[in-house]
Every structure is written in C-alpha cells, then in structure tokens.
C-alpha cells in the first residue's frame, strides 16, 4: 500500500515532538524591574530660551479697503496692539475705518491714538501708552 503524502515529511520535519526540548519553569511571582538611578548631581539645568506667557504683540497694518478693518479689529480683540497706516486709502474710507476701530477699542476697554499724520495706534486694555505725539504734528523741528 502506498504511503500517505505529508508536507512535513517532504520538508524533513517530524510530527513527533523533540524530547531534547524542555520548557523552562515559569516563576510564580514576577519581580518588577527597577528604573535606573541617576547619579546625584547638584548642578541645575536651566533652559536658555524661556517662553514668555504674557508677551505683548504689536501688529502693523496698512488697509486698502474698508473690509480690511475687520482683520484689524480681530487682532485688537485678541489682545494685540495695532499700528494702522492710512496712506493707501482715501480720506472718507480712512474716517470710516477709524470710526469702526474706535468702537472696537471701546468694546475691549482699549484706546486709539493718532501718532502720525495718517498713522494711528490701537491698543487693548492691557497696553499703556504714554506721551502725546499728536500735539507735535503741526510743528516741525528746524536745525
């Protein structure tokens, strides 16, 4: 009678267990590994660059159309000061933008100041501005 074909016999593997192999007994209790200890070093490590949580930010904007006032107002409501240069808009548009920013500054408890012929500084409540540049706009310094 013909012997039954088996893949394990074809590849030389025996179906019987190898008696030489013995399983290692498993320990009943496992020991938890201890973390490696560092040598006691008295020096302190300090980061050179630290983040400033209360860092102030001043943005500079030059609006060209009235709809640019929305992005300026968003920066103001986010707590950033904004310097606005109205050199590229006509006088009527500039007046509308200043009126809008006046309302925004009032809403956030801030203020708006003229610091140049066509330049305004809009600040939220957490900025303090000292000095008055607008009083000196009409006078020129001659040497």
UniProtKB/Swiss-Prot annotation:
Region (Disordered): 16-43
InterPro entries reported for this sequence: Cell_div_SepF, Cell_div_SepF/SepF-rel, SepF-like_sf
Transmembrane intervals: none
Keywords: Cell cycle, Cell division, Cytoplasm, Septation
UniProt record, GO biological process: division septum assembly; FtsZ-dependent cytokinesis
Gene Ontology cellular component annotations, sorted alphabetically: cytoplasm
Compartments where located: Cytoplasm
A Pfam family this chain is assigned to: SepF
Function text: Cell division protein that is part of the divisome complex and is recruited early to the Z-ring. Probably stimulates Z-ring formation, perhaps through the cross-linking of FtsZ protofilaments. Its function overlaps with FtsA.
Subunit structure and binding partners: Homodimer. Interacts with FtsZ.
Name the UniProt record assigns to this protein: Cell division protein SepF
Organism whose genome encodes this protein: Levilactobacillus brevis (strain ATCC 367 / BCRC 12310 / CIP 105137 / JCM 1170 / LMG 11437 / NCIMB 947 / NCTC 947)
Gene: sepF
